[in-house]
Amino acid sequence: RDVAPSRGLGDVYKRQIYIGVDDKDIDLFESQYVVPNGVSYNSYVIMDDKIAIMDTADARVTDKWFANLREALGDRKPDYLVVSHLEPDHASNIQKVAEAYPDMQIVGNAKTFNMMGQFFDIDLTDRKVVVAEGDKLSLGKHELTFVMAPMVHWPEVMMEYESTDKVLFSADGFGKFGALDTDEDWTCEARRYYFCLLYTSGAA
């Protein structure tokens, strides 16, 4: 549910590595949407002079997600965790990864941090990087530009555009239900995804 990743743990444009996890055991996404082909929890690592983790994953796949993260990092440690929004399938492991890497900074917008205390008991004093529309974060060769996208489909949603490889990390803005290795009618599922998750959150 972001930029289209390669299958498994592979490079997505040079040094942008997919560390997400397929979940084929789930029957209902968010306890309401039927997902006969499961879902994918999409997460990435951008490897550069500075390392950024782009979202985490659902608590259902914590162990596998951490294994993918550690494989991608090797002997390095992340500098940033970029939080697109706090929906559990993107954000459930924020506290665990913040505790695992105590020097890592957390990147979000003002609404992100206003809401975070409702989900996690975590002290982010001196660890918050608060961004707004158009702000930039340099990782070295890669640079992220932040685009606010409230109510797509949570109030604090933001997207990130990486200008070197021209990749948009679109949070829940584009995509479909279904695990990545499922062969299905992409157009039909993308339409259902839009009307279930996005259409109801837009302006009347």
Predicted feature locations:
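Acidic active-site catalytic centers that drive phospho-/nucleotidyl reactions
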Residues: 55, 87-89, 172, 202
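Short catalytic-loop micro-motif centered on adjacent basic/acidic residues
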Residues: 52-55, 80-83, 146
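Conserved beta-strand hairpin/beta-sheet module of binuclear metal-dependent hydrolase folds
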Residues: 16-69, 159-162, 166-170
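Active-site environment of divalent metal-dependent phosphoester hydrolases
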Residues: 88-91, 113-115, 153-154, 175-178
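Single conserved hydrophobic/aromatic residue that forms the stacking wall/gate
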Residues: 1-13, 199-204
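Active-site metal-binding motif and surrounding structural segment of the metallo-beta-lactamase
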Residues: 49, 60-107
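Metallo-beta-lactamase
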Residues: 14, 108-202
